[in-house]
Amino acid sequence: MRRLHPEPVPQLYEPTLESVRRHPLPDWYQNAKLGIFVHWGLYSVPGWAASRKDPYSIIAERGFDAYFRENPYAEWYLNSLKFDDGPTRAYHDRNFGKHFAYEDFQPMFESAAQKWVPDDWAQLFQKTGAGYAVLTAKHTDGYLLWPSQVANLARPGYRSSRDLVGEFVAAARARGLRAGLYYSGGMDWLLNPQRIDTPEKIYSTILDGPKYVEYADAHWRELIDRYRPSVMWGDIMYPAGANTLELFSYYYNRVPDGVINDRFATRFTPPQRPGLQPPAIHYDFLTPEYTSFDEIQAQKWETCRGIGSSFGYNRDDDEDSYLSAGAVIRMLIDIVSKNGNLLLNVGPRADGSIHELQRKCLLGLGAWLDVNGEAIRGTRPWSHAASTTLAGVPVRFTRKENTLYAMLLDTPGEAEIRIRNLHAAGGSEVRLLGIDERLKWRQSGSDLIVRLPAPLPDSPAHALRISVGT
């Protein structure tokens, strides 16, 4: 295997647990709060999944057998094809023919992707108010979105000749976004084609052995050397036998302000809670998937999820299966109040175009952040995340220096609201973001009473800025 040989770099970190744990969480990641995830690959050509329900609903209602057979994740199309009596196989045979192999999507994808204009994405993500974006450089199907010098062990030409990764990174940075890369380290269905139909098989099919360890490591080092990603977003563990501390120190020495997620475990241990993967020995942030936390977490975390129930493009998604901008806004507020980020996914079509309903959601989120972004970006959790008004409107808190933000997750029905368990110091100034007007307020015991402007703006959530008196 050929490897790139970059110029020597300062060795700030050694391949030891003690050394990599000294890596600080960079301010840019803590401050950004919102990232955009992009799942794009061969699975974008069929662009289909059998279910439009979120994974936890399917599992709760019908169990894991139904979940794997009718997987809502369109990016798992190849695994879903392996159920001979399943809906994906029926869809595939009807539309492409029973002798059409998954790998035959490669020329179709590469032809369609020629229409992709990278700045279209970057401009949209910038308008959304995101601080970073993460692209799937290699998903579980093993196909590479960059012209790697490290060929697939089973199918050497299984990679894009156009440098989709490089163009994505350059376009994102040109628009002021950080660029991160996703890589499925433990799973590659071209190298291990065993069907996954139980949770146990997710982990029993993880690849290992010296050849695959060298292969995955070489890919990551190539991605680091070429693109200097701000986020190393691994998935579904990492091959047993790999020295992840060497990989992490290699990365930190080249990208000192980069971050690494929690999905690089090289041996199975039970996840800390549903929605998390087995914990790695080191990480900068946790990654609950399609779920969240109930309380403020000391450890930085990032929820990842699609606007719909899939990460990859599902052509059957519609307004009923996509989240509205309002739902995403309220989700973001809740996550940020508990020390989290939101990595919100879009699934482009094979030609790079993004569904109009996904675009509508992103632009609605961006419009809200244009007015209320100061209550989100650059903030930290307060002493507690949540309260309510006397009338039951949910409230979430963030803080920034001498300013507290109280965000109402609905529009109150009364002109005067009473926020429970919130005390403002004498001389504090209360304003509603987006309106240049000081609001009248008074303290009543442990509650803060605020008279709102009339009429209130039409908005999914309203942010009060409480500038603490000094």
Regions found by a protein language model. Give the residues of each.
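Mature catalytic domains of secreted/periplasmic carbohydrate-active enzymes
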Residues: M1-T470
